[in-house]
Amino acid sequence: MPVFFYSRGYLITNKNRLITKVYFQNHTIQFYYFRAMTNEKAVAEKLLQINAIRLNPQQPFTWASGWKSPIYCDNRKTLSFPYIRDFVKSELCNVIFESFPDADMLAGVATAGIAWGAMAADQLKLPYIYVRPKPKEHGLGNQIEGYFEPGKRVMVVEDLISTGKSSLQVCGVLKDQGLQVEGMVAIFTYGFDVAAAAFAEAGVPLKSLTNYETLITLALEKGIVGPAEEETLLNWRKDPANWKG
């Protein structure tokens, strides 16, 4: 697991190496570490291991939207397993640190993204805020909780991307308050075409630790699903709104 030394003084990143120079009392201290890149398969394996993701084509789940789905994702479960929690936190930090090095602060999406955003901000030593789905109906009526200054570059942390609608609404709230949205990182994405189109239209780069294709491939390798079930799972992803099982 890498150790982060955060400095605006000097920073170089490439595929597998990070070099950071920290200036302290006229002396330069240089740190090196080497690591593998974000492992989508390893993240998917851990989510399956703790049943954070369940696959059941025979008895589909019903989402809040009314969609029938052969998959259910509950990334909140990872918070209850310390070693997996640390792994996911570090992977989030790696993505943010490498892909969005200019971010001034992080913003968590309420509610599931709040914990992950706070943990990543703590490890990266960045300021942190979180965004509610709507303004509070009492007190100060805040929709964004925490201190921020307009013009700052903010990275949004989310746990799950389905259609992307609610996640992008958060980006809109941040932009309306004068913040620059650098991008969004999520633990898992279903990879729906509608989500890809929405993020592209909004001009918000999206990164995820793992995705639907990786998950299905891994489930097939492990014998969790068979070839017939794989076809069902892939067909659902093509047209989830009209899929009936």
PLM segments and residue spans:
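Short hydrophobic targeting helices and cationic amphipathic motifs
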Residues: 5-7, 11, 24-25, 34
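Active-site-facing substrate-recognition patch
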Residues: 38-99
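Short, glycine/charge-rich flexible loops or terminal/linker lids adjacent to PRPP-binding catalytic cores
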Residues: 117-155, 163-169
